UniProtKB/Swiss-Prot annotation:
Protein name in the entry: Aminoacyltransferase FemB
One GO MF term attached to the UniProt entry: aminoacyltransferase activity
Subcellular location, principal: cytoplasm
The species this protein was found in: Staphylococcus aureus (strain NCTC 8325 / PS 47)
EC number: 2.3.2.18
Extra remark beyond the main annotation: Since cross-linking between the peptide strands is critical for maintaining stability of the cell wall, FemB is a potential target for the development of new antibacterial agents.
The reaction(s) this protein catalyses: MurNAc-L-Ala-D-isoglutaminyl-L-Lys-(N(6)-tri-Gly)-D-Ala-D-Ala-diphospho-di-trans,octa-cis-undecaprenyl-GlcNAc + 2 glycyl-tRNA(Gly) = MurNAc-L-Ala-D-isoglutaminyl-L-Lys-(N(6)-penta-Gly)-D-Ala-D-Ala-diphospho-di-trans,octa-cis-undecaprenyl-GlcNAc + 2 tRNA(Gly) + 2 H(+)
Subcellular location: Cytoplasm
Gene (name only): femB
Length: 419
């Protein structure tokens, strides 16, 4: 085996293997994204004795104190169950970094530590991947810890994932809780549609994202941040928009209302109606009243807000391994149409239609108590019967130890002065 720099083609061909469980940050498109952010990129990996790539990683070189911080965001990519391969990689990476002006290195691999069901009960027969964590530590890496909160300096360590293997949309939907099934069906009955946005329509996503940002108070990404991905990832970025055409909805309601009124009139015209028939008439009267109310509201809403209402939108990344929900927004004013539910249901079906076995709802804090900052997010994802995946976390290693000590000392001093 040999540790070496890789060409873009070598790197790209390797990470296309879905069995390697790679992240969308470890794809060739991210090279340009990082370069647009002002960073150099280097592709490092291992080749076997037949010159076949068996490990790869995309590193950003971040200039710091006359040296570089080497950061492989969600890398490296390899068969992490092969501890011998991981051991060799870490040993040879250290040698490389010693010769290439590295201050310190950060790795946050997309590697599983433990697996749980939706109720945080460990899967039977699964063990925590402590061997992998201990291997990093044996090479001088500091583990950032088994965190259970969001950290702006780190990628998420917990995820909610739908495993689609061996399932169909119908069998999967049966595993959802009653609220998820009910709200998806509501959206379908409303006639909510979903389409993919083009780049020149991306402002429609941003409008919903900014509204949600203001409502929820979360730390958001800039417009340029999103456009950087849109422009470099191409068809690996998917931006669905859930919307409703009120004109179509009003027409559908009117047709259903006419049908119910005709049925009610026909039943009323019969003489000597039984108790059972009278109950059916009473039920139809309730449905007619409801439909008339809905028809009036939809007609008024169309007049004031226009016939097309944008309900929810999201940014997704698709790679060889999965479809990953990155970020999203929705309109609170139109939440009765259940736009987010329809968007997720549409994208889950997209996975089935395009051969993906994983639909990743992505981030969770790891604190699953009712007082946690994202308990509502967890409950939403839990309702889809997700499996909870815990990743191994962040690892740091100083390479230029004297300069790293100075760097951390100055950083602590700056933080004290800010207080």
């Amino acid at each position: 085996m040999k540790f070496t720099e890789l060409t873009v083609t070598e790197f790209d061909n390797f990470v296309q293997n879905p069995s390697l469980e790679s992240h969308y940050f470890q794809v060739k498109e991210n090279i340009v994204t990082r370069e647009n952010d002002g960073f150099e990129v280097v592709l490092l990996g291992i080749k076997d004795d037949n010159n076949k790539v068996i490990a790869a990683s995309l590193f950003s070189k971040i200039p710091t104190m006359g040296s570089y911080v080497y950061y492989s965001n969600r890398g490296p990519v390899m068969d992490f169950s092969d501890l011998g391969l991981v051991d060799y990689y870490l040993k040879e990476l250290d040698k490389y970094l010693q010769q290439h002006q590295c201050l310190y290195v950060k790795l946050d691999p997309y590697w599983l530590y433990h697996l749980y069901d939706k109720d945080i009960v460990p899967f039977e027969g699964r063990e925590k991947n402590d061997a992998l964590v201990n291997l990093f530590k044996s090479h001088g890496y500091e583990h950032h810890g088994f965190t259970t909160e969001y950290d702006t300096s780190s990628q998420v360590r917990w995820m909610g994932v739908l495993n689609l293997e061996g399932k169909t949309p119908e069998t999967l939907k049966k595993t959802f809780d009653s609220q998820r099934k009910r709200n998806i069906n509501k959206a379908i009955n409303y006639g909510v549609k979903v389409r993919f946005l083009e780049r020149d329509e991306f402002n429609l996503f941003l409008d919903l994202y900014r509204e949600t940002e203001e409502r929820a108070g979360f730390v958001s990404k800039t417009d340029d941040y999103f456009y950087n991905f849109i422009d470099t990832y191409g068809d690996k970025v998917l931006v669905p928009l859930a919307y409703i055409d009120l004109d179509e909805y009003v027409l559908k309601l009117q047709q259903e209302l006419n049908d119910k009124e005709n049925r009610r009139d026909q039943m009323m015209a019969k003489e000597n109606k039984s108790d059972k028939q009278m109950k059916k008439i009473a039920e139809l009267d309730k449905q007619i009243d409801h439909d008339q109310h809905e028809l009036l509201n939809a007609s008024e809403l169309s007049k004031t807000d226009g016939p097309i209402l944008n309900l929810a939108s999201g940014v997704y990344f698709a790679n060889a391994y999965e479809v990953n929900y990155f970020s999203g927004g929705s309109s609170e004013k139109y939440n009765q149409f259940m736009g987010p539910y329809m968007m997720h249901w549409f994208m889950i079906n997209y996975c089935f239609d395009n051969g993906y076995d994983r639909y990743n709802f992505y981030g969770l804090s790891g604190d699953f108590t009712e007082n946690s900052e994202d308990y509502g997010v967890y409950r939403f994802k839990r309702g889809f019967n997700v499996q909870i995946e815990e990743l191994i976390g962040d690892f740091y290693k100083p390479i230029h130890k004297v300069k790293y000590w100075l760097f951390t000392t100055l950083d602590k001093l700056r933080k004290k002065l800010k207080k």
